[in-house]
């Protein structure tokens, strides 16, 4: 339901989550509570089982190994300013599979390959401010508690000068962000920083 009791939005079932560091499709519950005279305080809380990649309900994975929950707090109390804090806790464990391996006696045997690993815990902040409708600042920073690193940061400034001249400056920092069991960890990678500007 939407705007229940003028304070609450409720979503139940399969849905796409887009809440700062929390992104993905889950089967679960999403609640948004809106408070304040102008609904300037908003808190979204969500949780559930990660939807299978096939989006089918057959062979549904165990929730204890495939889940996603988190929250995002929004603030709109200052004119033309929006700020948000987010937290995401997600765990997706690949399905086990059978494969042929060589044992210590060099015999070919079939083994079941299983996976495990910690949940992915992320936190972030997003800021957006517009001044006099003409000038804008946007910034964000996302941190991975599991890997203990900042994996994304961004700052963007746009200014409108007299004669409708517009200038901008932008800084972006990125690190590849893989899940714990991803095959991409075997490859070398570099951090990426970009600085740009123009008029």
Summary of predicted features, one role per range:
Residues 1-199:
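Gram-negative and organellar
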């Amino acid at each position: 339901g939407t705007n229940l009791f003028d304070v609450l939005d409720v979503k139940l079932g399969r849905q796409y989550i887009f809440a700062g560091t929390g992104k993905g499709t889950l089967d679960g519950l999403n609640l948004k509570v809106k408070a304040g005279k102008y609904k300037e305080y908003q808190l979204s809380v969500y949780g559930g089982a990660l939807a299978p990649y096939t989006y089918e309900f057959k062979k549904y994975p165990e929730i204890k190994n495939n889940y996603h929950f988190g929250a995002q707090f929004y603030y709109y109390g200052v004119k033309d300013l929006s700020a948000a804090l987010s937290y995401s806790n997600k765990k997706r464990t690949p399905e086990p599979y059978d494969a042929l391996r060589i044992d210590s006696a060099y015999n070919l045997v079939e083994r079941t390959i299983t996976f495990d690993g910690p949940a992915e815990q992320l936190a972030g902040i997003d800021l957006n401010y517009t001044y006099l409708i003409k000038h804008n600042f946007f910034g964000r920073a996302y941190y991975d508690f599991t890997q203990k690193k900042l994996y994304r940061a961004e700052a963007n400034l746009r200014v409108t000068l007299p004669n409708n001249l517009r200038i901008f400056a932008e800084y972006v920092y990125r690190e590849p962000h893989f899940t714990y069991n991803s095959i991409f960890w075997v490859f070398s990678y570099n951090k990426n920083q970009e600085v740009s500007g123009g008029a």
